[in-house]
């Protein structure tokens, strides 16, 4: 897979690309991440990538010419990180990971000239109902979520148990020591009984989702076991 990221601040991606899972995925060839400096497509003396908005108002707007030119040199679905976009989630990530190439425009200032959005952008995505200084962090979040779903980047079992992957929040995790400052790990996790452990994890996943994100439960078609466990949870949480 190839991910192109168009940005005015390419150095912001140095750490993102050189550490942890993303760095390993790049090293063994699961993904190529191409950081494109939008100013490389600004040909005036000052490399100006933004200008004042027509009609007046605060802030600056990213100019159309550099973005149109930069987009001529990439392919694949074009995503624009924008507060006006659809909220990015795990289901969208599972669809985007099927693409061979993606291009993400990291917006900045008051955003990009609308002609770019109308003529070049396939999808506007937001990572939440809040405002960032620029779209670089959103581009990293979207890229990270997609890359970890690529084959062999991490074990399939690892991401399938993540929050949201199966429509539920993740269950609690514990590691050694089994007791610390009189705080004990749940006995079932030490039992070696994998059937009971799996059921405990499902129940705690349901519990967290029920208590913290109840709408996910309401939109889910529950299995017979999930219904049974949820009934138990409701009685326990009264």
UniProtKB/Swiss-Prot annotation:
One of its GO terms (molecular function) is tRNA (guanine(37)-N1)-methyltransferase activity. One of its GO terms (cellular component) is cytosol. S-adenosyl-L-methionine binds at residues 107, 127-132. GO terms for biological process: tRNA N1-guanine methylation. The keyword tRNA processing applies. It is an enzyme of class 2 (transferase). Pfam families: tRNA_m1G_MT (PF01746). It is found in: Cytoplasm. Its main location: cytoplasm. Its EC number is 2.1.1.228. It comes from the Bacteria. It catalyses: guanosine(37) in tRNA + S-adenosyl-L-methionine = N(1)-methylguanosine(37) in tRNA + S-adenosyl-L-homocysteine + H(+). InterPro entries: Alpha/beta_knot_MTases (IPR029028), tRNA_m1G_MeTrfase_C_sf (IPR023148), tRNA_m1G_MeTrfase_TrmD (IPR002649), tRNA_m1G_MTases_N (IPR029026), tRNA_MeTrfase_TRMD/TRM10 (IPR016009). Keywords: Cytoplasm, Methyltransferase, S-adenosyl-L-methionine, Transferase, tRNA processing. Homodimer. NCBIfam families: PRK00026.1, trmD. Specifically methylates guanosine-37 in various tRNAs. Belongs to the RNA methyltransferase TrmD family. This is tRNA (guanine-N(1)-)-methyltransferase. It comes from Fusobacterium nucleatum subsp. nucleatum (strain ATCC 25586 / DSM 15643 / BCRC 10681 / CIP 101130 / JCM 8532 / KCTC 2640 / LMG 13131 / VPI 4355). The gene is trmD.
